[in-house]
């Protein structure tokens, strides 16, 4: 009982613990009827190849644990039935054994297989069957820490991931970031599993980065030294920190021998062994006796010793001094009990309740316990504590797997400890594997120790690393001086990279080795060096003087280089300076260069114009020279560049860069300067920025600020000039007028220019700003009655009502804050005036918009351009619309193809048509109707009548030639040829006209009827444009005359056809119309209509009437009688203009253009009479082109008449 120690780490005792501890002091016998038998299933490994977890060398630990529990006063009410089945670390066998234990036999508790693969399956099955499952042996993988996945698994082994995080914490403390990972080959890959978790910890650790340069397996046998050497040689060239996972004693000793042979036991190397077996530098004794020679403080035999000595014990011990071992605590509460366990474990395996009867178990009595037998002892001991605690508190929960699992955590309520678990504290007992405590993940809380050998070759704990659930590791140091950890390294921590590098070729050279030759050389050349230094000293002095002269030469300008420009060039620059900006100057010819730069002289320096001011010659010292050098270096957008000073003439000339627009005083003084508020802001802002730059420069003040010293460049940017020359006297005594810009304190005193302070510049800036805002000279002297002396006197007098310029904006809208700022700047008290920095900041906030003045001007021009583009686009649209209207109007007057040629300036040649049909109509008794109407009523009558006629025309392939008074002339077959359909189009048009007239009503004469007389003729015709002014599309030929005669010889409401028209109609459209012969009629043709034909009778002609359509033959065609109610809506004029070509080959028949009167039309209702005795010809017909066409169309008779006409014309000219 004295060997069981409970340690309360983070709280006090609880009632449950009190019950446990009370049972340790008094053991009450339990009646047999009340005793309970715990059925335990053990998934074991029998193979002798797995000695570290083999059941023959491990199973006796359960009997010893049961005996230990009884001796300590626990499990008094329990008996145990142990049932063993073997898995041999096979997954399928593990599944079979798990099914047998948990499903078939339903054991109270199962001790799982000590291998990871079958244990994973059994842990999953335990979750399903809610069976408590105990883990030991090689089960260290981090996946077994998932309490949600394996809630019934309790693992006595610490997980290797915690080992990995603790190792990385050590790396961080020692500043090791380059390591090698070695692991022993094993049938179960147990060392590889640990190394993989270590590598996972290295990758997941966020606070420190470690580079794994080698990850390699080392053989565990004795026959692979060459492979071992190859691995170690690879490490030697890459790193010095070696981490190794080697579990058993023999491979560990071999590792010590191999690193000794490969010279890896120097002060540069650190070898770290990882383990979870609580053995540190020790090993299990070879026999059943306890360690008696050179034992470690843990009671174990050192790993480097073998009996009998093979000659390597001492060398292996020296190699072990280069080792650090990270393992579970090896502290054992009772070394005597450890020795008893070691000697009896093998013999106990055949005793009940284990009762192993195999041959291996019977032979195990002479063998030492396996490497993990102690962990089996501790896990069963832990289970015994848990069931005892449940039996004493709530025996019903003995059948509750979850309650048993929770009881094994040895938890109790109390103050929480965030280091381990946020709601529970953890109790610890000391077992054979050290301190044992289970966390909330049902996994052992690892208390890892870092062991090293001290000067007595005994292991000592130098660090205590405890891993918590949140992934962190807390470190408790076991030393006060780190040098004690590195006792075998002369007290110095090894470096990640040796000083000389991994191959020893990068050692830093000593001073003598590196600089010895130089030291000896220096001794030989000291004399020469001293001489050289003296020479260099004088050379430097000379060079400094030359450099100073060179720098002075930069600002010293020879007078001969300043050339006076010609007078013409002066005038050109003057005009340029005034004209190129936002100004309203109208007469620039009167502006001269002199009044643009009234305060400066103009010169050319290196072909560039410059400005200059004259000063009397004076003595200049070095300070003045340095000032001029600094002046040349001043550079700011609002500071005029100081070019230099000419001092070799009768007077000094200060040269400044040219600003082509002149001074602000001169520009405002012209009186014709127009600016907007933004320009005002820009100028004032530029002056303030320039003044701010000067105040922050070495000058600290301008001291001569006025509108005359503010120049404007081509970009309308204000630049301050005439600064920094305070030590140079003025050529003349300063004019009284300049005092208008001086501050009152300057006027009152006798201050020299270099004594003027910054507030005086602020005052001058305010005066200039008033000039800009009012666009008038300072104090508006041209309109004031006061003289300059009076104003200066009042300024000097000061007082509460001191005089200041008027800020009359003359209707310009300006930010009121700017006016307030200006008034503050010319305050009487200099201390009340704001500084240049404050003024600049305020002006930035007041600016109506960002950007400079040129951007403003460009924006104005851009807006103007945009507006102009919009206006041009609108005007273009209007022009296009008007052009379209004109084209539509022209299309009504002339055929489109004719109009297009005329618009292109081309000649329109007459065109002959072989067959057309001409239509003439006349209103019957129109003269009598006109007498009954007013002129306006006559116009309205004809407009209503002919407008509807025009609409009817659009439904037929007819072209309207003209209408004169009550006469109406149409033609079909031109200008677009339509074969023989022209006769039908005209007949259909005539019938529709007649039908419409029957329905037509005269509004003011409702009883009167409108009747038409229609004449139709078919035949050849010539059409062309006559004249250049008001051209007309006219028809020529006998066909037109005959058609006119048909109309004049017709009858009211009748359609009169000539024989040619009737023959054409009957030939192509027989039986479609009701016709009748009128008989023979005497027809006469008047002059003009017949081409070059005098009054000559046509003679007797047979003519015909067309009455109506013959519906029996025409059917339901579209050529029925016209109904004005069904008339189609007239299309828009824009749609009437088609895309036909100029040759007239594709004109739509329903879109005839409108034309003017044909001069060749015959007079209406001419009485027939005899022909004239002498031929008379129309002058309209005298056209060479028409004459040529006439010769092509008419017969020999026409040609004879033409020759007769030419003879008469010749006689008339004579």
Curated annotation (Swiss-Prot):
Source domain of life: Eukaryota
Cite the record's tissue specificity text: Expressed asymmetrically in ASE right (ASER) sensory neuron.
Please cite one Gene Ontology biological process associated with this protein. Answer: cGMP biosynthetic process
- Give me the Extracellular side stretches, as residue ranges: 19-517
Kindly report every residue range on the membrane side named Cytoplasmic: 539-1214
Write out the transmembrane intervals: 518-538
Annotated Guanylate cyclase domain ranges read: 917-1047
Enzyme class name? lyase
> Gene3D superfamilies in the record, alphabetically?
3.40.50.2300, 6.10.250.780, Nucleotide cyclase, Transferase(Phosphotransferase) domain 1
Q: Indicate how the chain sits in the lipid bilayer.
A: Single-pass type I membrane protein
Q: Cite the record's Acidic residues compositional bias ranges.
A: 1133-1142
* Swiss-Prot/TrEMBL keywords: Cell membrane, cGMP biosynthesis, Glycoprotein, GTP-binding, Lyase, Membrane, Nucleotide-binding, Receptor, Signal, Transmembrane, Transmembrane helix
Q: What is this protein called?
A: Receptor-type guanylate cyclase gcy-19
Tell me the organism. Caenorhabditis briggsae
């Amino acid at each position: 009982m004295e060997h069981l120690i409970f340690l309360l780490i983070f709280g006090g005792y609880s009632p449950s613990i009190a019950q446990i501890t009370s049972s340790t002091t008094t053991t009450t016998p339990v009646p047999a009827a009340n005793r309970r038998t715990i059925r335990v299933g053990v998934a074991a490994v029998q193979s002798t190849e797995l000695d570290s977890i083999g059941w023959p060398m491990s199973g006796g630990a359960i009997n010893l644990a049961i005996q230990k529990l009884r001796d300590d006063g626990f499990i008094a009410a329990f008996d145990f039935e142990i049932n063993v089945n073997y898995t041999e670390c096979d997954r399928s066998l593990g599944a079979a054994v798990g099914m047998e234990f948990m499903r078939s036999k339903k054991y109270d508790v199962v001790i799982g297989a000590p291998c990871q693969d079958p244990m994973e399956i059994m842990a999953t099955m335990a979750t399903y069957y809610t069976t408590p499952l105990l883990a030991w042996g090689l089960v260290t993988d981090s996946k077994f820490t998932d309490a949600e996945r394996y809630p019934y698994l309790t693992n006595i082994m610490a997980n290797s991931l915690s080992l990995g995080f603790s190792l990385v914490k050590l790396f961080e403390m020692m500043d090791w970031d380059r390591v090698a990972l070695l692991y022993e080959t094993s049938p179960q890959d147990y060392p590889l599993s640990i190394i993989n978790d270590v590598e996972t910890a290295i990758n997941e650790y966020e606070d420190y980065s470690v580079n794994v340069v080698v990850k390699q397996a080392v053989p565990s046998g004795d026959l692979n030294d060459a492979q071992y050497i190859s691995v170690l040689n690879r490490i030697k060239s890459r790193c010095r920190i070696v981490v190794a996972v080697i579990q058993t004693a023999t491979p560990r000793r071999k590792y010590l021998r191999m690193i000794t042979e490969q010279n890896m036991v120097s002060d540069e190397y650190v070898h770290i062994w990882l383990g979870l077996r609580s053995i540190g530098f020790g090993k299990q004794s070879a026999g059943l006796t306890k360690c008696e020679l050179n034992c470690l403080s843990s009671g174990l035999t050192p790993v480097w010793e073998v009996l009998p000595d093979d000659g390597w014990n001492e060398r292996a011990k020296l190699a072990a001094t280069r080792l650090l071992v990270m393992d579970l605590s090896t502290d054992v509460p009772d070394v005597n009990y450890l020795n008893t366990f070691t000697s009896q474990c093998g013999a106990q395996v055949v005793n009940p309740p284990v009762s192993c009867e195999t041959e291996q178990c019977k032979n195990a009595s002479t063998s030492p316990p396996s490497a993990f037998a102690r962990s089996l002892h501790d896990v069963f001991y832990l289970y015994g504590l848990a069931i005892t605690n449940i039996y004493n508190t709530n025996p019903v929960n003995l059948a509750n797997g979850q309650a048993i699992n929770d009881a094994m955590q040895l938890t109790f309520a109390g103050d929480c400890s965030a280091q381990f678990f946020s709601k529970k504290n953890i109790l610890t007992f000391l077992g054979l594997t050290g301190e044992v405590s289970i966390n909330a993940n049902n996994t052992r809380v690892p208390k890892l120790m870092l062991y090293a050998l001290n000067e007595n070759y005994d292991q000592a704990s130098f660090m205590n690393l405890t891993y918590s659930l949140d992934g962190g590791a807390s470190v408790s140091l076991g030393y006060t001086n780190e040098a004690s950890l590195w006792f075998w390294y002369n007290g110095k921590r090894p470096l990640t990279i040796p000083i000389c590098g991994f191959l020893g070729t990068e050692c830093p050279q000593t001073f003598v080795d590196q600089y010895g030759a130089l030291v000896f050389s220096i001794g030989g050349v000291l004399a020469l060096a001293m001489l050289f230094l003296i020479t260099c000293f004088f050379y430097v002095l000379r060079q400094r003087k030359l450099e100073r002269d060179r720098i002075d030469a930069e600002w010293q300008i020879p007078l001969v280089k300043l050339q006076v420009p010609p007078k013409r060039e002066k005038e050109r620059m003057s005009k340029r300076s005034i004209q190129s900006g936002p100004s309203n100057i109208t007469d620039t010819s009167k502006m001269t260069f002199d009044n643009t730069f009234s305060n400066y002289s103009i010169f050319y320096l290196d072909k560039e114009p410059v400005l200059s001011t004259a000063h009397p010659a004076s003595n200049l010292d070095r300070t003045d020279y340095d000032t001029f050098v600094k002046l040349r270096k001043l550079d700011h957008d609002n500071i005029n560049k100081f070019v230099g000073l000419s001092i070799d003439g009768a007077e000094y000339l200060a040269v400044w860069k040219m600003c082509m627009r002149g001074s602000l005083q001169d520009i405002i003084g012209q009186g014709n300067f127009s600016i907007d508020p933004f320009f005002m802001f820009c100028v004032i802002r530029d002056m303030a920025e320039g003044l701010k730059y000067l105040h922050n420069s070495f000058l600290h003040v301008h001291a001569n600020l006025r509108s005359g010293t503010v120049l404007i460049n081509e970009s309308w940017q204000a630049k301050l000039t005439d600064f920094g020359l305070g030590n140079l006297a003025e050529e003349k005594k300063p004019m009284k007028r300049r005092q208008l810009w001086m501050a009152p304190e300057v006027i009152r005193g006798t201050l020299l220019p270099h004594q003027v302070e910054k507030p005086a510049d602020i005052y001058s800036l305010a005066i200039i700003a008033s000039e800009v805002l009012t666009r008038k000279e300072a104090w508006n002297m041209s309109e004031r009655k006061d003289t300059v002396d009076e104003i200066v006197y009042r300024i000097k007098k000061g007082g509460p009502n001191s005089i200041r310029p008027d800020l009359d904006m003359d209707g310009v809208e300006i930010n009121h804050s700017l006016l307030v700022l200006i008034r503050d700047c010319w305050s009487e008290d200099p201390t009340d005036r704001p500084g240049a920095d404050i003024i600049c900041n305020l002006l930035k906030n007041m600016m109506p918009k960002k950007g400079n003045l040129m951007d403003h001007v460009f924006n104005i021009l851009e807006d103007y351009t945009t507006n102009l583009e919009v206006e041009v686009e609108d005007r273009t649209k209007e022009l296009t619309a008007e052009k379209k209207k004109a084209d539509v109007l022209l299309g009504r007057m002339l055929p489109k193809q004719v109009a297009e040629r005329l618009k292109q300036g081309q000649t329109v040649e007459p065109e002959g048509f072989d067959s057309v049909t001409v239509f003439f109509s006349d209103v019957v008794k129109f003269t009598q109707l006109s007498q009954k109407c007013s002129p306006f009523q006559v116009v309205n009558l004809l407009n209503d009548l002919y407008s509807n006629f025009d609409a009817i025309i659009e439904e037929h392939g007819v072209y309207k030639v003209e209408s004169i008074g009550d006469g109406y002339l149409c033609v079909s077959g031109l200008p677009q040829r339509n074969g023989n359909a022209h006769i039908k189009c005209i007949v259909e048009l005539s019938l529709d006209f007649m039908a419409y007239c029957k329905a037509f009503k005269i509004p003011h004469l409702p009883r009167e009827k409108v009747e038409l007389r229609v004449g139709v003729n078919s035949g050849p015709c010539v059409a062309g444009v006559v004249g250049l002014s008001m051209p007309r599309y006219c028809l020529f030929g006998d066909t037109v005359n005959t058609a006119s005669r048909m109309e004049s010889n017709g009858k009211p409401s009748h359609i009169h056809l000539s024989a040619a028209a009737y023959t054409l109609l009957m030939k192509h459209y027989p039986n479609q119309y009701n016709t009748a012969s009128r008989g023979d009629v005497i027809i006469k043709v008047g002059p003009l209509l017949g081409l070059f034909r005098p009054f000559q009778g046509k003679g007797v002609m047979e003519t015909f009437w067309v009455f109506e359509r013959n519906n029996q033959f025409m059917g339901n065609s579209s050529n029925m009688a016209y109904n004005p109610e069904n008339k189609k809506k007239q299309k828009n004029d824009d749609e009437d203009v088609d895309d036909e070509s100029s040759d007239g080959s594709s004109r739509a028949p329903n879109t005839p253009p409108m034309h003017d009167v044909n001069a060749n039309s015959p007079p209406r209702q001419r009485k027939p009479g005899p022909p004239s005795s002498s031929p008379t010809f129309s002058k309209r017909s005298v056209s060479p082109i028409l004459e040529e066409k006439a010769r092509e169309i008419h017969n020999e008779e026409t040609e004879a008449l033409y020759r007769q006409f030419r003879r008469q014309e010749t006689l008339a000219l004579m």
